[in-house]
């Protein structure tokens, strides 16, 4: 199952972004394909979080939207 998460911003130390990254890691450990997408991404997180403009942001079986 593909489970993607959308958050408005991914900043290190931000509760929503940090929680979303932890959830993504847990989903991956459980055998699911999972990625995190954001509108605004800190430079240091660009290798870990994908932009909303990525075509893969629209694929998946489940999308979790956090605000």
Predicted regions and their residues:
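A short, glycine/small-residue-rich beta-strand->loop->alpha-helix junction that serves as a flexible
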Residues: 7-19
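Charge-rich, low-complexity amphipathic helices
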Residues: 18, 24-25, 49-50
């Amino acid at each position: 199952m593909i489970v993607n998460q959308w958050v408005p911003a991914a900043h290190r130390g931000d509760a929503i972004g940090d929680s979303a990254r932890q959830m993504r890691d847990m989903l991956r450990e459980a055998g699911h394909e999972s990625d995190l997408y954001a509108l605004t991404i800190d430079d240091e997180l660009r290798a870990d979080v994908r932009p909303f403009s990525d075509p893969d942001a629209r694929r998946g079986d489940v999308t979790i939207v956090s605000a």
